[in-house]
Regions:
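Catalytic cores of the polymerase beta-like nucleotidyltransferase superfamily
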Residues: 4-197
Length: 197
C-alpha cells in the first residue's frame, strides 16, 4: 500500500512483527498499524482468546465497542469507503459507548472490556449505553479473572484523564470499585481521616 501510493521514504520506516501478524508504518508523527482480520473464541475461565485467521466481518464482530469496529476499504474499487456494520460512526458522533454484539457475551468473554468501557467514557466524555452499562453490573464479578497489572493499567488511564472523577463514579455505580479497589471503596462517605479532610 505504501509503495503503491508513492511514499517510498515511508516504506523505509516500516516494521513487521511476524509473531503477532502485524506491520507498522511511521509517517511524520503518525503511526499506523496493520493487522490481518481475525476471529476469536474464548473459554469461560480465561480472557485469553483462541485466535484464528478470519474475515473482515469476523474481525468487526470481535471488537469491544461499535466505535472500534469501523473499517476503511483499501481495495482499489472502493478505496476509502467506510465499512460500519454496527453504526459506530453514529455512536461516535453521539458520544455513546456500546458493544457491537450482546454486551453480556462481550464482557463475559473479556472482562477487561468493562474497565475499557468506563475508561473510554471517562477519556472521551462519552456516555455508556444503558444495556451496555447494565451488562457491566451483571458481569462485574468476571473481573476477578483479570490480572492486577491489566486492571492497574486501565485505572492509570482513568486517573490521568481530564476528569477522573467520572471514571470513579462509573466504577462505583457499576459495583466494580469494591472488586478492583476495595481500599478506596472502604473510604466512601468518610470526610476526614486522622483529622484531615
Amino acid at each position: 500500500l505504501v509503495r503503491s501510493r508513492g511514499l517510498g521514504d515511508v516504506y523505509k520506516r516500516q516494521s513487521v512483527f511476524k509473531n503477532f501478524g502485524t506491520a507498522q508504518v511511521k509517517y511524520k508523527d503518525i503511526e499506523v498499524e496493520f493487522v490481518g482480520a481475525r476471529r476469536e473464541s474464548y473459554t469461560h475461565d480465561s480472557r485469553k482468546p483462541i485466535v484464528e485467521d478470519g474475515t473482515l466481518c469476523d474481525d468487526q464482530n470481535r471488537r469491544d465497542f461499535t466505535i472500534n469496529a469501523l473499517a476503511i476499504c483499501l481495495n482499489k474499487e472502493h478505496f476509502g469507503e467506510l465499512i460500519d456494520p454496527f453504526n459506530g460512526m453514529e455512536d461516535l458522533k453521539a458520544g455513546i459507548i456500546r458493544t457491537p454484539l450482546d454486551p453480556d457475551i462481550t464482557f463475559s468473554d473479556d472482562p477487561l472490556r468493562m474497565m475499557r468501557a468506563i475508561r473510554f467514557a471517562t477519556q472521551l466524555e462519552f456516555s455508556i449505553e444503558k444495556e451496555t452499562f447494565s451488562a457491566i453490573e451483571r458481569n462485574r464479578k468476571r473481573i476477578e479473572i483479570i490480572s492486577k497489572e491489566r486492571i492497574i493499567d486501565e485505572l492509570n488511564k482513568i486517573v490521568t484523564s481530564s476528569k477522573p472523577s467520572t471514571g470513579f463514579i462509573l466504577l462505583d455505580k457499576s459495583k466494580l470499585l469494591p472488586l478492583i479497589f476495595p481500599e478506596l471503596n472502604a473510604l466512601k462517605g468518610i470526610e476526614t481521616i486522622d483529622g484531615r479532610g
